[in-house]
Amino acid sequence: MFQKRKLLKLLLPALIACPLVLSAKPLQNKQLAGPPEEFELMRQAQPEKSALNSKTALIPVSLQQTKDGNWYWSGTLPVDSSTFSFMTFANGSTDWQVSLINPSSGISYSADSLATEHVSTNFGLENSNYPGEKYSFDNLVTGNWVIEIKTTGEPEQFEGFVLASSNSKYLLNSYKTNNDQIIGHKIHFVTQSTSNERTLSFLRQFSPISHAHMLVTNPDGSQNKYSMYDDGNHGDNRANDGLFGGDFSALQSGGYTVQINASGKNPDGTPFYRTSEHFVPVIEQTISLGSNKASAATISDNRLNIAFNVNHDLEATNTNYRIIAEVWGKNNSSEQNKLSYDGVENYMKPISWISTITSIENNQLNIELDARWIEMANASEFLELRNVRIEDANHFIPLITKDKMPLTVASLPQMKSKKFDGSITEEMMLGEKPVQTSATKGVGTKLLLVHGYCSSDVWGPYQGQFSNSAKFTDFNQNISHNTFAQRIKNFGSTWNSFGVVAHSQGGAASLHLYTYYWSGLDYSTSGKRMIQSVGTPYHGTPIAGNLAALGNVFGVGCGYNSNLTTSGASSWLAGIPTWARSKVNYFTTSNTDRWWQYNYCSLATDLFLSDPDDGVIEKFRGQLSGATNQGHKTGWCHTLDMNYSGQTSDSNRNYSMSANANR
């Protein structure tokens, strides 16, 4: 039935005259390009680079009624370090009574009587957070404790979680191995033991993990359990090498929460139990190629338009797609020009990569190529495309991939007969810059202060520290980088030009805007820094997956955001070129580390994150290669409600950013 429905969609006639398609045109998408040296940067990201390393276990709690009318739950709490913490998440209810049973003596204790500290705190990202109770222990006996939760009478909250966190050096490394997150496809994960961000060779021999499985929460809320194997037959390399693999079929569109569970025994004999949480969006296969060739035709003195014929359903006409491809051509020599297509395979040379974000028009997706790249490479008109990816522009999931694709060229631009000095120009990298007219340009210049995901007014109290500024106020929103970028552009269209100072996701959205769309950023000439960001998770944050798991029980809050996951951020970055990154100046922060005391930005998120972190992002995930690192400052946290002052309240940094900003 699914195949019939899919085929019917693809055969439906396309109705192109759609207002939403027309409304996308004012965004004036750029036509990106760059030299062959950047091919590797623009290729699909290696999945293992976005892996999560977990020191925690998120254990579901479901209270059941007892004969006496009270409610009860118990579970195993594996403790592998004398310094240990756990949190209970009960959606703010206060009637959960927590006790622990010693694995050696069998004696039961209230958690409060054993804990060296018990505090109420919140776990989350910006305004999307969940309350919890944190219990910390300094001299806990290792072993499998029993944790009990009771209520007198009916509980305020029937379901929740226990989050256990250990100071043990043994971690759980896991990641999704494939990018084709499409209905009907299999989603594959692997997991293994690791330590200090590196897989240890002796762990491969010892293999602390004896059992692993995936608990998958489907978009409709149902759950399924799938075993993972270390047998060499499940995408896990060799049998008994410590790497476990498993997969499941994605039969619904929407967001999946995948929890990897792994248990076993550490080399020191203590129990090993870790989980990691991943958010995985799955979309429909809305488009397919209508031809195995692309066609190119001259559209100006310097430019070619490359067209992909596509079959699509009706919904696809309202969707933006990101195209990325490499252009290769035959060496421009008389001897090789005599060869047929099959005969020139060994004579092809790289010309450039190209990319854009666009929509379907007249059953085609179109992208442009500046013919000066062909001239630079001294290639003939015999061209082909390689490593073609056509992705949806919200999650950056590839819908179409082709290793090689012939490119039929009707004619080359006239510039082929003109002299070209070999210098790479802005037009070659970004496309033809629109001419501002009195009808299209705004008035004056401005510095835009942009917030992040699900954010409150983080810049408002400090706007006076930024001269000639305007505050972007799309608060408490959960939107993709692409939608976020378009909203910034529309807000900034009031002015002739603007620069950006951005917090959190706002930094990634601003970079996305400059990369793919013409806006006031491209006309800002005053100042030294076009885009400045503070606390931006360019490589995502593990918290995004944990929030999805909690949201399945307590409600989604602002909602799940795939662009903020480590794998989603990696997919997005695999289309951001060097020339765009170079326009970014970024800042990171963390708590002040004092050896004599426990320091943190957020008690709850510190259980998940690797030091140093700002309570939301780890320092290493806030780096952006190709951009300018303006430094890491301690004593500042991601938001105002954390243990140190919020990043946006740093007056010294704010005045400096204002003085250096483009407008």
Region annotations inferred by a language model:
Residues 92, 307, 370-450, 454-461:
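Flexible, membrane-associating and regulatory peripheral segments of lipid-active enzymes
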Residues 81-85, 137-156:
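Noncatalytic modules at the cell exterior or secretory-pathway interfaces
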Residues 117-135, 141, 232-248, 352, ...:
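Aromatic sugar-binding surface patches on proteins
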Residues 55-65, 91-131, 163:
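Surface-exposed beta-strand/loop patches in noncatalytic accessory domains
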